């Protein structure tokens, strides 16, 4: 279920972290740049009401990214952070979970370069929705605006639109990758986008894992 830890609007400070790394895929070394940041959602009065946190991986040796695919991914629940698709599937580094003689399914795990990472062909954005992971509800009185099927999808679309504008990715093919309830989130978000006309009909493809 969602967590409801809150911050006073006048004390919330958006966070942003950047780093660089390299990964070898199919024998080729690929450099990437990572930006982890709050994506703040503001109310009509201009005060922050919530934040969706994103972990974005950009391949940094690509000169023209305007048409490069972007995969937006999240877990389900609802109420789960993106930790599982991040550390177990799509991140440049992941847990080593294929040890056949492992005594327990629980951690600690070794962390290795992810041989199945998609960074060679697409940029990757992992998402913590409001109330999960580092995604926070800032104004407790606005719960009803985020904790519901349509509300959750609407908040996701709001942040996706802002992210696409911020990084000039309007022409990029965009894929919504959801696990479990994340598939429902993707379908609802795509449905909202498809029925809102040209303002939001920017083209989404769905991936279910």
Task: Name each model-derived stretch.
Residues 60, 162, 192-196:
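Active-site catalytic microenvironments for nucleophilic, acid-base chemistry
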Residues 166-171, 194-203:
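Secondary-structure transition/capping motifs at alpha-helix termini
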Residues 169-181:
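Alpha/beta-hydrolase fold nucleophile elbow
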Residues 208-209:
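Conserved small/polar residues in nucleotide/adenosyl-binding loops
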Residues 179-191:
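Glycine-rich nucleophile elbow surrounding the catalytic serine of serine-hydrolase chemistry
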Residues 146-164:
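Alpha/beta-hydrolase active-site loop
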Residues 2-3, 48-145:
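N-terminal cap/lid subdomain of alpha/beta-hydrolase-fold enzymes
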Residues 1-70, 88:
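Catalytic-loop region of hydrolases
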